[in-house]
Amino acid sequence: MPNVLEDLASGIVVTEFDGDTGIATVVNVSGWLFENLGQVNNYLYTNFEGEGASGTYGEMDIEAQSVLKELYLANYYNKEARNALRGITTSTASGDNVLSLRDGESAVTFVNRNEVSKVYRGLATDCMNRVTQLAAQYNIYQAQPRQLGGIDASGIGVTYT
């Protein structure tokens, strides 16, 4: 049985982080995806479980995978927003946060951590809006008719007298 979550995690690392394992590793991403399958189940009214992400109707389809991917990205951006406010986002040396220098009248401009955090929060909000949109589309297009009547019901082999 293929490991859907590991394949999805590999895709996230390659496409979203350009394969930079310093940002996220496949193991970390697939672990997060596995631990948060319940969120997808809540949004999509499904029951995916296990490493193969299988449920009542089989393996997790591509639409459900895209919802899980957006949930991961929203979580990642929220975490980065918190880290930016703490001032620890990829800041290894003093001076990493210098934005510009001017020699005339000696001006130094630093990165505004609050603005960086707002950008990350905006990205997280965009991802959650996308999750809501994708979940609604998934639930609409995966819905089965509850009742057949009229012309649709003719020819199904049932005769009412």
PLM features: residue spans?
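Conserved short "hinge" loops at termini or chain/domain junctions
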Residues: 1-61, 133-161
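Divalent metal-cofactor coordination and adjacent catalytic microenvironments
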Residues: 27-130, 137
